[in-house]
């Protein structure tokens, strides 16, 4: 997106759902509601994991990292989207678009890797229980989490830097809800074969490879769980892993639809709704799924709330 396009002066026109005013008003309320719940849910999950010593384990360390990524990821999109939907002028500044491009892609890529790391953690816990503490050493866990954040940053710098260099020849209308790499590549007025190939490679590395690793991990996990003699033990193991698997299917499925499916095979509105799903809906699902399906988290949350209430009444 070179400055000769005047994009840096005029910004980009985000059409979103402006051609359907009633739908846009409805989505505004839904997105605002989901965003607030996502912030509250993920923040509560981070606080519980930090404040309750019983949750100072690798699983909850990665879960708190996931919640942190989700808060940042949805915040990189939702506020701008709400502002744009609530005003007549749908223009987004050039700098805002570029910043959103880098941040959203970096955080989304980090979450892709982090979910695979969490699958490995579950594999180690279920299939290597006697060596679990030795395998998932705190330094190793920190390295895995740091690697997930760093890998997202690196791929974002590479992919987005290539994208912003594309000449747009004055084109500044984005028929989408926010600035995203596939949409900006389509706006370019030159051959984008290299950019599309690079995006495809990045998508394979950050989507297909993690999904395959997760499936392999859960294959071993399923075998190990079926060998557990205790019905209660099997139920607990399946409950923990199924929660993670639900998040994985929803998150990867929607992003694969957006990034690996040819654009001519989906309608413009399909792409918009799919983008809403992995930027707004999925970050809300994580705290709900992990809280409602996890007795440890529910117990810790209950203790935290009751403790705060007791402390407040004692002061009074």
Curated annotation (Swiss-Prot):
Cellular component, GO, one term: plasma membrane
Transmembrane segments: 26-49, 58-79, 101-120, 140-158, 196-219, 237-259, 273-292
Family: Belongs to the G-protein coupled receptor 1 family.
Keyword ATP-binding: no
One of the Pfam families matching this protein, by short name: 7tm_4
Record-linked PANTHER family: OLFACTORY RECEPTOR (PTHR26453)
Function: Odorant receptor.
InterPro entries in the cross-refs: GPCR_Rhodpsn (IPR000276), GPCR_Rhodpsn_7TM (IPR017452), Olfact_rcpt (IPR000725)
Main subcellular location: membrane
CDD domains on file: 7tmA_OR2B-like
Subcellular location: Cell membrane
Glycosylation sites noted in the Swiss-Prot or TrEMBL record: 5-6
Topological type in the membrane: Multi-pass membrane protein
Keyword field: Cell membrane, Disulfide bond, G-protein coupled receptor, Glycoprotein, Membrane, Olfaction, Receptor, Sensory transduction, Transducer, Transmembrane, Transmembrane helix
Cytoplasmic topology ranges: 50-57, 121-139, 220-236, 293-316
Name of the featured protein: Olfactory receptor 2G6
Chain ranges on the Extracellular side, renumbered to this chain: 1-25, 80-100, 159-195, 260-272
Disulfide cysteine pairs (residue numbers): 97-189
Organism the protein comes from: Homo sapiens
Gene name tied to this protein: OR2G6
Annotated GO biological process: detection of chemical stimulus involved in sensory perception of smell
GO terms assigned for molecular function: G protein-coupled receptor activity; olfactory receptor activity
């Amino acid at each position: 997106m070179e400055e000769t396009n005047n994009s840096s002066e005029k910004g980009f026109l985000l059409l979103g759902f402006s051609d359907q005013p009633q739908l846009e008003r409805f989505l505004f309320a839904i997105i605002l509601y989901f965003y607030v719940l996502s912030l509250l849910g993920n923040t509560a999950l981070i606080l519980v994991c930090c404040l309750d010593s019983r949750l100072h384990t690798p699983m909850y360390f990665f879960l708190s990292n996931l919640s942190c990524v989700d808060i940042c990821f949805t915040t990189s999109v939702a506020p701008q989207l709400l502002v744009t939907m609530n005003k007549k002028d749908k223009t987004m500044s050039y700098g805002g678009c570029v910043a959103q491009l880098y941040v959203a892609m970096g955080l989304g890529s980090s979450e892709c890797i982090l979910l695979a790391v969490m699958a490995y953690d579950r594999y180690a816990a279920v299939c290597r229980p006697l060596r679990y503490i030795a395998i998932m050493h705190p330094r190793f866990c920190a390295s895995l989490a740091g690697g997930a954040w760093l890998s997202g940053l690196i791929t974002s710098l590479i992919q987005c830097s290539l994208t912003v260099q594309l000449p747009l020849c004055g084109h500044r209308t984005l028929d989408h809800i926010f600035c995203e790499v596939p949409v900006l590549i389509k706006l370019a007025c030159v051959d984008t074969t290299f950019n599309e190939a690079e995006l495809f490679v990045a998508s394979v590395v950050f989507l297909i490879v993690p999904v395959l690793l997760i499936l392999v991990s859960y294959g071993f996990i399923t075998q190990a769980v079926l060998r557990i003699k205790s019905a209660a033990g099997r139920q607990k193991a399946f409950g923990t892993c199924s929660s993670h698997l639900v998040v994985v299917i929803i998150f990867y499925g929607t992003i694969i639809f957006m990034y690996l499916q040819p654009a001519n095979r989906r309608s413009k509105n399909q792409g918009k709704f799919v983008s809403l799903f992995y930027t707004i809906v999925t970050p809300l699902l994580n705290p709900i799924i992990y809280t409602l399906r996890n007795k440890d988290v529910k117990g810790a949350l209950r203790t935290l709330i009751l403790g705060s209430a007791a402390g407040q009444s004692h002061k009074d």
